[in-house]
């Protein structure tokens, strides 16, 4: 465990050094008066009057919530299933991490295909497709009885595809719709909605996991994704 953390920390420092060496130096600029935080927040919220930006905010909420659900609860589900099957905690934890690895690898290979699609379609349509994949990926997990069963991995492949699709759709939509005059405030609010999604997914998901079961967490995210899809259809047509 310690070795893993040291390796990750070393990779972060190495990446930081490469970025520091490779970034082009900026040109001198004149300092201008900073707007108060309240005005920046107000500008970000006011931008949600544009239904396309509101859709991007909602998608960010889901996409970041997806991330924490997959990273935390898929892992936890695999670990608890392993312990219930009689594995020792270390081996069960490894099984749980394997589920997360499957979702991550699936997303890694799927993302280039999703990027090609998003470049060729209307961004609203692309977001609807992405959120539909997210809804399907999370809801299909409901049919899994044992996450460690030999054939269960395919459902976690779909889960990884859905999770990365939601993230890609939200990011591409806000990059197009954020107005130049208030781009910083709008992108900041977009990320704030994402942070709220992380908190929501952690808090509510944890309670559902304990009180109902692992499936409930994924069904919750899938159902919320369906709501975003319906809103996207309204915005598009």
Sequence positions of predicted segments:
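C-terminal membrane-cytosol helix-exit motif in multi-pass small-molecule transporters
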Residues: 10-29, 231-236
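Juxtamembrane intracellular "pre-TM" segments in multi-pass secondary transporters
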Residues: 25-58
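C-terminal ends and interior cores of transmembrane alpha-helices
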Residues: 132-146
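Intracellular juxtamembrane helix-capping segments at the cytosolic ends
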Residues: 165-178
